Amino acid sequence: MNPIVEFCVNNLASGADAAFAKLDADDNLDVIEYDCLTYCDLCATSLFALVDGEVVRGETAEELVANIYTFLEENPF
């Protein structure tokens, strides 16, 4: 079973789309897009994804990707 990375469609429109594309190309991750993750305050102010249910943030799409991989290294299955 792969780690699950979840994105809000509104956050993708705010700039997380590049992170989504990069992570989606990784066969070791299950990357999912949802209409809403109910983190509207967070979604309006920063780029983020839920990684196995935990919030991971980044100031840029590149930082978000790096932070997600760091989170996965520090929190293996």
Swiss-Prot record:
Superkingdom of origin organism: Bacteria
InterPro entries hit by this protein: DUF1450 (IPR009910), UPF0349 (IPR022916)
Pfam families: DUF1450
NCBIfam families hit by this protein: PRK13669.1
Record's protein name: UPF0349 protein lmo2392
Family in the record: Belongs to the UPF0349 family.
Source species of the chain: Listeria monocytogenes serovar 1/2a (strain ATCC BAA-679 / EGD-e)
